[in-house]
Structures are given as C-alpha cells and as structure tokens.
Amino acid sequence: MKKMAIACALLSSVVASSVWADAASSLKSRLDKVSSFHATFTQKVTDGSGAAVQEGQGDLWVKRPNLFNWHMTQPDESILVSDGKTLWFYNPFVEQATATWLKDATGNTPFMLIARNQASDWQQYNIKQDGDNFVLTPKASNGNLKQFTINVGRDGTIHQFSAVEQDDQRSAYQLKSQQNGAVDPSKFTFTPPQGVTIDDQRK
C-alpha cells in the first residue's frame, strides 16, 4: 500500500509537471505570434483589503525580445524604455533618469516577462492554463511577486494582466486597441532632457 501511495504521488508529480510545461509552451507560443505592437492601457492598484490605491493610464510599445517603451501618462508621468542594452527609467516630476543594463534587470516582474517572452523566464513559474487565462506562481518564494495572471488570445493579443504581491496588493492592467505591426524605432531610444539628473548604474 505504501509503495502504491509513493507511485501515485510520483505519477501526480509527473502529470503536474507535464501540465505546467504544456501551459508554459502554450503561453510562449501565443506571445510569439506578435513580435511588435502598440497598445493603450489602464491601471488599477488595490491593497490587500480591495481598497483602491491608484488608477492610471498610458501607452505601451513592444518589439520582442528586448525593445519596449512603457509610458505612464496619468496620474503621474513616468517612462521605462529599453533600447536592447540599456534600461532607462525617467521621472519628469523629479527630473531624474536612471540607467541600468537590461541584462541585469530582474526577470520576475510581469512587464519584463511579457516583453522578453523567454523560455528561461517562464521556467521559473508553475503555470496553469484556463482558456485564454494563464496563472503563474513563482517556484521560488523569496521574491515579492505572489502570483501573476495574463489573458492572451490565440492570436497573441494581450487583453489584460495582473500581479499580486506578497502583501496582497494587486496591480491590474487592461490593454486596449492593440495594434500589431512595425513600431517606429524612435520609441525605443531615450535621450535624457537637458538639466535632468542622471543616475548611471551601468558599472
């Protein structure tokens, strides 16, 4: 009986691993169908009790695997741009721009996962698929991300995604008017405006 229980446990583990692998493959395959796009987005952040913390909106341009421009326009403007090597974060309000190497950027944030769509990133998660919804749970428990959910159609269109942190704060993003196709290369370059303080962390 004990051997039977052990065998069943091992089988369950193998089946679960297979399901997670299939879900990861399906997610990557769907995202691979669109190499570049532009979309507008709305953001809603709620705390652990469900109370609203912040609402915002902006524009997103992506050219996989390493070019992207995340432009938050409301409530406060901020810009996150990758030119393929350097990751720039610019906050016009405080007039400061931070530069880091893209290769050193964390791969466990929802946006980086979507923009890079690398198999090595998805392997860090247990992934379950329910139709167009994919629920990702980090295999490691030492990060701030508790769960990540993304809704992406068979044609590669991302409809929405959300992230739940360890303190149960939830950030939900809804993408609208996704336009697939070539994106102006200038969207993936950034030149700090004159007078802006630059924090260059590319060491």
Swiss-Prot record:
It is found in: Periplasm. This is Outer-membrane lipoprotein carrier protein. SUPFAM superfamilies: Prokaryotic lipoproteins and lipoprotein localization factors. Its main location: periplasm. Keywords: Chaperone, Periplasm, Protein transport, Signal, Transport. Residues 178-203 are annotated as: Disordered. The keyword Zinc-finger does not apply. PANTHER family: OUTER-MEMBRANE LIPOPROTEIN CARRIER PROTEIN. GO terms for biological process: lipoprotein localization to outer membrane; lipoprotein transport. Monomer. Pfam families: LolA. The keyword Signal applies. GO terms for cellular component: outer membrane-bounded periplasmic space. Residues 1-21 form the signal peptide. InterPro entries: LolA/LolB/LppX (IPR029046), OM_lipoprot_carrier_LolA-like (IPR004564), OM_lipoprot_carrier_LolA_Pbac (IPR018323). Belongs to the LolA family. Participates in the translocation of lipoproteins from the inner membrane to the outer membrane. Only forms a complex with a lipoprotein if the residue after the N-terminal Cys is not an aspartate (The Asp acts as a targeting signal to indicate that the lipoprotein should stay in the inner membrane).
